Amino acid sequence: TKGNFKSLFCSTIVAKTIRKNIKKDILLSYTEWTLKPWRFMPFPKQIDETNIYRDDLIKLLHCLNKNSQNDITLKYNTDADGNEYTTNEIKKNFKKLNFIQTNLRKRGFEFSSKYKLNIKTTNSTGFLELLALNLPVILITNKIFFDVKKEYKKIFEDLIKCNVIFFDPKKAADFIKL
């Protein structure tokens, strides 16, 4: 810590250098959450919360797809059961999207350097890695899934003011279209 500033240190990217190789427009990353109650964290923990998360994603995609010139690729992680609940609903609503299925063993930033914009849907290590690597990223999440330690609140408040973090999919889509 220097002065009043705390850095967002990510041990997963120490000594990593990313060469930007931008070929595509938008990479939207999301997670297939389990539909059964599980550990207490600020993520969807059961089907009701997963529906909120899924509906926010669909709303964002509808807003982005209206007159959009952007090519959108969706990257998702499945849960331990191989559940594709959210993905199946997205595929029903949108026929022309590209999907990449990954697992948690591969680091997300390995895909991210190829895109003009990365959209994260949870306040996670992946979001912090992209910020620390200076790759273009925004976070779009519901406030019920957003929790920040007290010591980092000021940093995250600044990210909200600078339009790096959004809680409304429509506002985020309007910002992306600028």
Language model region names:
Residues G3-E89:
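Conserved catalytic-core segment of nucleotide-activated headgroup transferases in glycan assembly
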Residues K24, Q46-D48, N65, K95-K96, ...:
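Alpha-helix initiation/capping motif
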Residues T50-Y53, N83, L104, K149, ...:
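Intrinsic-disorder-associated interaction segments
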